[in-house]
Regions:
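Terminal targeting signals and extreme-terminal segments of soluble enzymes
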Residues: 1-146
Length: 146
């Protein structure tokens, strides 16, 4: 990727992070999500796996995973709409859990992407990846522009 495109992607990632810190869910801001890559329609971010997000079985809770997947699509929507600050909402989020995320794995990566962008709806896919690259969960989602 040429340097100008890499710089544009870094600027987009920083803009999304700043906007989310300013107007996003306070709860999700406490998750310490870090956007590591962004381009229009795609955002990759990490989540530190810490004890407060895990349940007694020693794995990351499904509630935390779902919240991150929904937030990942928020990031994607922000990457698509760079100028108008349009509002949007979740219409549908369906998740499949494939394997547990061990409490002591460090951090995990989420990759969220728009699969089809329309005038009123955006269809998305979000994957949760373990540090070794194996997928732990995936979701499909539909968002609506308001």
């Amino acid at each position: 990727m040429p340097d100008a495109e890499q710089n544009d992607d870094r600027v987009l990632a920083a803009r999304i992070a700043a906007q989310f810190q300013e107007g996003g869910s306070r709860l999700m801001c406490e998750f310490d999500l870090t956007i590591v890559d962004a381009e229009p329609g795609f955002v990759r971010f990490t989540l530190p796996v810490v004890p407060r997000l895990c349940h007694g079985g020693g794995v990351l809770s499904g509630q935390a995973i779902l919240a991150c997947m929904d937030t990942g699509m928020v990031f994607v929507m922000m990457s698509i709409d760079e100028t108008s600050n349009a509002t949007f909402t979740t219409v549908h989020l369906q998740t499949a859990f494939e394997r547990g995320v061990p409490e002591h794995c460090g951090e995990v990566t989420f990759e969220a992407r728009a699969m089809k962008t329309g005038w009123s709806l955006v269809f998305g896919q979000i994957d949760l990846l373990l540090p070794d690259g194996r997928r732990a969960a995936s979701a499909t989602t539909t968002y609506m522009w308001l």
